[in-house]
Amino acid sequence: MKKILIGGIRLYQKYISRFTPATCRFYPTCSAYGIEAIQTHGALKGSYLAIRRISKCHPFHKGGLDFVPPKKDKNADSEHSCKAHHHH
């Protein structure tokens, strides 16, 4: 699913975006953000983050730097909770 979504974004970048004026209010661009979000967080959460970002890309939003949030390390959380419940 990730490959299909990223492929769709790449098609947009290659065949649509390059022929339109640069209007994205953010860095990285919304399409680059979408690819990174899907690569980092997977198809479902990455798509959610991309849609949320695109919904902010309008003339009434100031834009600016907006990077994909890092993926939370699930092992660190489970390791911590495991240590907290382990009796010596």
From Swiss-Prot:
Where are the bilayer-spanning segments? none
Q: Which UniProt keywords apply?
A: Cell membrane, Membrane
Q: Which parts of this chain are annotated as the region Disordered?
A: 66-88
Q: Where in the cell is it found?
A: Cell membrane
InterPro entries per the record?
Answer: Membr_insert_effic_factor_YidD
Q: What does this protein do?
A: Could be involved in insertion of integral membrane proteins into the membrane.
Q: Which family does it belong to?
A: Belongs to the UPF0161 family.
Q: Which protein are we looking at?
A: Putative membrane protein insertion efficiency factor
